[in-house]
Amino acid sequence: MSRKLFSVLLVGLMLMTSLLVTISSTSAASLPTMPPSGYDQVRNGVPRGQVVNISYFSTATNSTRPARVYLPPGYSKDKKYSVLYLLHGIGGSENDWFEGGGRANVIADNLIAEGKIKPLIIVTPNTNAAGPGIADGYENFTKDLLNSLIPYIESNYSVYTDREHRAIAGLSMGGGQSFNIGLTNLDKFAYIGPISAAPNTYPNERLFPDGGKAAREKLKLLFIACGTNDSLIGFGQRVHEYCVANNINHVYWLIQGGGHDFNVWKPGLWNFLQMADEAGLTRDGNTPVPTPSPKPANTRIEAEDYDGINSSSIEIIGVPPEGGRGIGYITSGDYLVYKSIDFGNGATSFKAKVANANTSNIELRLNGPNGTLIGTLSVKSTGDWNTYEEQTCSISKVTGINDLYLVFKGPVNIDWFTFGVESSSTGLGDLNGDGNINSSDLQALKRHLLGISPLTGEALLRADVNRSGKVDSTDYSVLKRYILRIITEFPGQGDVQTPNPSVTPTQTPIPTISGNALRDYAEARGIKIGTCVNYPFYNNSDPTYNSILQREFSMVVCENEMKFDALQPRQNVFDFSKGDQLLAFAERNGMQMRGHTLIWHNQNPSWLTNGNWNRDSLLAVMKNHITTVMTHYKGKIVEWDVANECMDDSGNGLRSSIWRNVIGQDYLDYAFRYAREADPDALLFYNDYNIEDLGPKSNAVFNMIKSMKERGVPIDGVGFQCHFINGMSPEYLASIDQNIKRYAEIGVIVSFTEIDIRIPQSENPATAFQVQANNYKELMKICLANPNCNTFVMWGFTDKYTWIPGTFPGYGNPLIYDSNYNPKPAYNAIKEALMGY
């Protein structure tokens, strides 16, 4: 049947109860119709999907934003799913389509059970990216959806990532946004379903800037629906008429007597789901899902990282006080599946971090919900649902790789779990199995913890040197101390039987220290110790300064000579002379060099700050600067501060700067991508102050970097500037340690980049210097204890030359040598920390 004849027949249907005008696509064989009674009601015997609450960091708003995700019945990470992004109306929220009358999850459950659609995932964002109904929020939400939410979903759920498995639909304001986002991003969406579109709908010439050419070529389904009594009917009708005039295939459905409410929106969704399914949304993409890699049982397994689920009530929840994620709203009979758990030579105990206001049981079964029972954790009350504690139980010995089922016999919140696994016969600490415990094993553990080369099987079991049931930075610290002979046995070896190694390990003695300088001890501990330098000093204007610099430090960084105004004082005129001199000094003295900094809101030349830029022209300036500078120093600078001090001090988004104000919120993504292209081997850092401990600004930067990693932005590390005031408390120092550890969990290196500890001039120097020494020592110990911390750079080394008095009146003496080049107590304290004291 020709399209012309088909259209004529459909016009005849206009006399029916549901007024219908359709210009049909060949991929949509069915016609819209009113759904049967009970289509949106929970039915007995119908498997139910799960609706989970999520939060993600948005680069558009520089904040954490909420959304909800519908996972279909039987959701499994072994399968791939298509995704519908379903938008709410003005003044609404991410809850409306599930709890505000929409019942989208129930509609989908029933359609899946009837075989009318294949299982898919539905995501309901909060579209108020500036504020409810605020116009700027429309543009912000587009960036939020495309640059943050979609990448988050694709990183955390088993979904297809191509346009032909992605749809967008919405009601009222969300209908207008479906038009706007869908039709102007046809490289992202093939199925678009505006229902009762609101006045925020773009004009036709903006929706179809090419006269409809892309829509004709790329659209798999454009479904437009509205009620005949809806005062907003004209907005969808306008688009419909344009499509008719320009031969754009679409479906236009009017519900006779329908208003602006869920009596139209739910039938619209019911039809859109089926027509999108028929048009190919949920077709098999023929993309095989790889078999999950075995997960070692003795590592910490996050509860939310399950591979299968049977429950519609379980939700991913926040875990106080750390702010992580866990599983809650569990009911009796629910179970979670964790595939390919490697129990190694034998697991004999189970440990979980749980919260429970009452008591309940968790059954541990293998390879099925009714499979072999290996143990039961009797969960004791922790007092309330927000108080978590570790609880353990013994289990029957289990070996090899099995699927684990946690079968719940009552409510409980669970953060993570792990198993106690017997150690390998080749001995703790001998990660490469060569019979020796030495720096090669330490490097292997460091690469594992950084996510560069994950350990598996026997090697991972041997890495648990403190026998805690997980492999983390504590094991790195213990192994390092063992290799340096600070300790002579691993924790627990005196009271826990360890199998005799087949080859007796020969312990490597502490590395030979070729001198007595800080750099000698730092090299033995595997870290770099450095200082910033200003041009006159590495130009040998002060011989004493120069002598200390080359003797004590293994890394240098220009204080000012490699900032934008110094390197490119006039557009396209670069001056590398001073930076090159420091590099030559470093190379002569066996030092490494950090690059500081490519992008900053300060110390920019006037031609840049006063220029008449638009987004594209300023991006070109940015790319040219980063590419030219990094290419000049390619292979010679090991760490680059790509961007410096970009977060507002409040933590509420990026600070105002020429980069943010002209390019937009995504300018950092471009900067890091340009940097990686210029020098693929350099480590790329974001550097900032007041982000060392846990707090609003620190949390904002962490969430920003985590989001960048999830989106594939090539960032390797974060620089903690560490400009401190003397007298840091143990609690404050512990907070720094916690912050470093959370970066390790997402595979991010931490460098201490600009350390100084300023002292109030009113304090007694003798007492203050000792407090300062203790603070420096604790900072070094924190860095040594964390394998993702390998750089310890001070912002100068002598109180004779420091920026502090001129910037912080009433403060001084921040460094480790006094003004006469005498080592202060802080110098010796750092050395003691490096020696393991």
UniProtKB/Swiss-Prot annotation:
SMART domains: CBD_IV (SM00606), Glyco_10 (SM00633). Residues 299-420 form the CBM6 domain. Residues 424-492 form the Dockerin domain. Its EC number is 3.2.1.8. Disulfide bonds join 783-789. It comes from the Bacteria. Residues 512-833 form the GH10 domain. GO terms for biological process: xylan catabolic process. Gene3D superfamilies: alpha/beta hydrolase, Dockerin domain, Galactose-binding domain-like, Glycosidases. It catalyses: Endohydrolysis of (1->4)-beta-D-xylosidic linkages in xylans. Coiled coil: none annotated. CDD domains: CBM6_xylanase-like, Dockerin_I. PROSITE patterns: CBM6, CLOS_CELLULOSOME_RPT, DOCKERIN, EF_HAND_1, GH10_1, GH10_2. Keywords: Carbohydrate metabolism, Disulfide bond, Glycosidase, Hydrolase, Polysaccharide degradation, Signal, Xylan degradation. One of its GO terms (molecular function) is xylan endo-1,3-beta-xylosidase activity. Residues 1-28 form the signal peptide. The keyword Hydrolase applies. Pfam families: CBM_6, Dockerin_1, Esterase, Glyco_hydro_10. The active site is at 645 (proton donor), 754 (nucleophile). The keyword DNA-binding does not apply. Belongs to the glycosyl hydrolase 10 (cellulase F) family. This is Endo-1,4-beta-xylanase Z. The gene is xynZ.
